[in-house]
Every structure is written in C-alpha cells, then in structure tokens.
Amino acid sequence: MSEMQGNKIVVDPITRIEGHLRIEVEVEGGKIKNAWSMSTLFRGLEMILKGRDPRDAQHFTQRACGVCTYVHALASVRAVDNCVGVKIPENATLMRNLTMGAQYMHDHLVHFYHLHALDWVNVANALNADPAKAARLANDLSPRKTTTESLKAVQAKVKALVESGQLGIFTNAYFLGGHPAYVLPAEVDLIATAHYLEALRVQVKAARAMAIFGAKNPHTQFTVVGGCTNYDSLRPERIAEFRKLYKEVREFIEQVYITDLLAVAGFYKNWAGIGKTSNFLTCGEFPTDEYDLNSRYTPQGVIWGNDLSKVDDFNPDLIEEHVKYSWYEGADAHHPYKGVTKPKWTEFHGEDRYSWMKAPRYKGEAFEVGPLASVLVAYAKKHEPTVKAVDLVLKTLGVGPEALFSTLGRTAARGIQCLTAAQEVEVWLDKLEANVKAGKDDLYTDWQYPTESQGVGFVNAPRGMLSHWIVQRGGKIENFQHVVPSTWNLGPRCAERKLSAVEQALIGTPIADPKRPVEILRTVHSYDPCIACGVHVIDPESNQVHKFRIL
C-alpha cells in the first residue's frame, strides 16, 4: 500500500524472514535523484542484555541473524576479553581466525552466486546457449575441466523448470521476458547458472569446515571469554578434516568464483561508474594480538574522499551514533559506550524519522564499510596479497583503480577479499598443527571480573566493520551497544542530513525500466545487506509508485 500527500510519500514495506529493509528512491529524467534507506524491524537486543552476565552476550547477539552467525559471537567475546583484560593463548587466536576464514569463504560464495548473481545473470537466457561453445569458453577461462555434457545437463534442468511453470525463486525475476539491463551472452549465462548450482554444494563444505572448530553452524559455541573450548578439534584427524574441506572450497574460489567474477564484470564495465561513495573505514581482521589492530592480517585504516595516496589510522573514539532520523528518543549523537536505545515509533517520515537503524558516523561523516573498504585500505597500504589480486582484476578488465569506487568495484572487492583470506587460512592451519605437534595445546586463560570496566570488540565481518561495546559493573552488563555493518552502510541520514553510504551510492543510478528496477538491486545487493528488502520507486513526473521485491 502506498499514498502521496503533497511531497510526502508513504510506502508499506515488503519484508522477509531474515530482516526488513525498504529502499525508496525518486527517479527524475531516468536517474535516481534522492534515496532513503529504511530498516523497519526493531529487535532491541541491547535492552535484553542489560543486567545479564557479560559471558551470555555472545549467545544472544549472534542470534540476531542466522546468516552472519559467528561474527557476532566473536565481537561479543572480544568485547568482554577487552573488558576484563585477559590475554588469550595463541592457539585460541588461530582457531578463531580459522573459523572466521571459513566464514569469509562461505559468506562471499553464497553472496555472489545466490544473492547477487540474479542481478547480472539471465538464467532463462541460458537456454539459448550453445553448450559446446560455452564449454570451450569455460575451459579458456579456468584450468578446471568443463564438459559439453555437463552444461547440456544444466540446460535440461533449466528447461524442465521453465516448462513446469513453477519457477520457485525465479518467479519474479526481472530477466523474465527480457530486460535491456541484462547483457551477458547466452554462453556466459549458462556457465554462471551451472556454477550457481554447483556453489550450493560447495558452500555446505565451507559451513562444515566452520563447524569443525566452531562446534556447529550456524551459531558457533566454541568461543568463551579467555579463549576457546573446542579441545577436540586439536586432534590430528579433525585438523586433517578441516584441511580437506578447506582445500576443496579454496580450489572452487580460485578456479571458479574469481573467473566467473571477471567474466561477468567484463560485460558490465559501465558499472564502474555507478554506485560511488567517498569515505571508507575498516578495523582490519585476523589478528596475532587481539589487542593490537595493527597486528591484523588485513590492515585497519580510514580513506577520505577516495584518496588512495593517504590512509589515516582508525580511532575508535571518533565514532558516534546519530538518532535524529531514527525511531529512537532524542536527537543527540553518542559514542557507543554512552549509547542509548529507547524506541520511539512515529510513522514513516514522521518527525523526519524513517528507520530503526541508527546512523553511525566517524568524525561526523558517513563511511562505507565492507569488502570494498577493506580492499581499498589494504591496496593503499601495499598489502602484498591484496595488491596482487587487485592488479590482476584491473588488468583483466582493462580499467584503472578509480573503477574500484563503484558498484562493480564493490562486487569485485568481495571476491578479492574472499581469495586473500582463503589463501592465508593455510598459514594459520599449519601454525596450529605445528603447535599441537610440539605439545602446545592451550586454548584458555583464566580471568576475573574487575569491579567495573568497559571493553570493545572489533570484527571485520564479511559485510564490514562490526563492533560490540560493553560496560559492566559487578559482573553484570550495565550498557551494551553493537554497531553493525548494515547500520554504517544502510542507515538513515544523520543530524547533519548527510546520507548513508547506500543512499549516496544510489544517487545518479540510471533506471532503464521503472517497473523492473534491477539497477537498484545491483547497488543495494553489492552491500550484501543482512536484512530482507523491499524496493520502491517513486516517479515525481507521473506520481506513480511502484513496489518491488528484491530477488
């Protein structure tokens, strides 16, 4: 349902089970001129945690989502580790890193193939492909052998699905009936569709690898304040099991994911000029010392104004959360340690408030977090594995570094981050195995609560910088705030009316067909929002409102 009252547009959201997001945009002259990102779900986890034992935090926070899973547990545990001042054993850090590495591999594969691919790949067009020609192309792109027969089998599956009339997840796909924004040759569509199906099996292996150290997936239960508990995973046979699964997934990443990414991107190079933002922030990830952000394998840093010649150090003291345009009491910005979560529902745009998300700002400015931020900082800091991967992508596509600041660059960065993390997993695994063989099997350090203290845990999750902030007194949580990647990227305006990252990125995006705005989905999905989404397009020239589901 929607209505227009003067300049005020109200659109009911379309929601899904993993969360609720609505995007409103105004289109003028075939391009987006204004955008609003609206989260319509209130959870109030911070309120639930007050008065509880800090050790309980991870069990609540990671259940905010079954997709993000481990990252919230790790952020909570790191926050309490920091709060009590415990130094965890090296093996515990390695085990945490290995589980996070497996999460990166799983998360980015699922995103590219199963959450984002349909924005670029026309599955129906795969029926028009020549399987023999497609097989030759696949073999030219990758050292992995692809047969004509295997692609014929995929075509048969797609044909049977189409002829059944029961299209399942493809029912509302924008490519059905043809769409001018889909430009891949039929053979590339067929290859991508085949790998879409194969990735369903591969991602299970990554999830199983996570569960070897994490005890289960989703919602790991091996982290504790002071380290880890999964001593069983130190057995040689368990380490060998992880290594086998890891190698299978890494091979798929190197020989399939990256080649598919480059193949698809080559036909959409115009998207290197769409979806641009200006500021980027990352806390880095995969530490050797949990208390030193500079010890992390992928570096921390801040980039201003798309300037790769300079990277500032990240200063956590400069973070504030704004609520002037959110459904919370007050209008003042607060540092997370002083954060207040008191809901105040109005209506959409009532008192100018339009989202349950707060608006994080760093030094008063909106920042993008996520794979693109991480890759840009690492590239600017001459992080060797990242430089090698980025240069390969730029050379293959025939574009310069400026192309990274875009929807296409954001999607490519996710693959680059997946690749560089996967390559380093073997280093951590070898180190853990060597420690165990040398008789070094400690995973936990004992600790005590101070009378009162505060702490923060930073995790560079697959979707971007995540932080949990805790204040405890007498072993009970007095205040708890979490600042998640989606609030950085998909939050509302701040007190200074500065747009969030996705709101900025959508401005100027061309829309070929307002009734099927796949262009909006491409940019929104490039952030991998961990919430269900509804997209609405308002055309001020016709006063017509269109509702869409993100597929």
Curated annotation (Swiss-Prot):
Gene3D superfamilies: Cytochrome-c3 Hydrogenase, chain B. One of its GO terms (cellular component) is periplasmic space. It is found in: Periplasm. It comes from the Bacteria. Keywords: Metal-binding, Nickel, Oxidoreductase, Periplasm. Its cofactor is Ni(2+). Binds 1 nickel ion per subunit. Signal peptide: none annotated. Residues 537-551 form a propeptide. Its EC number is 1.12.2.1. Ni(2+) binds at residues 65, 68, 530, 533. Pfam families: NiFeSe_Hases. One of its GO terms (molecular function) is cytochrome-c3 hydrogenase activity. Coiled coil: none annotated. Heterodimer of a large and a small subunit. This is Periplasmic [NiFe] hydrogenase large subunit. It comes from Megalodesulfovibrio gigas (Desulfovibrio gigas). The gene is hydB.
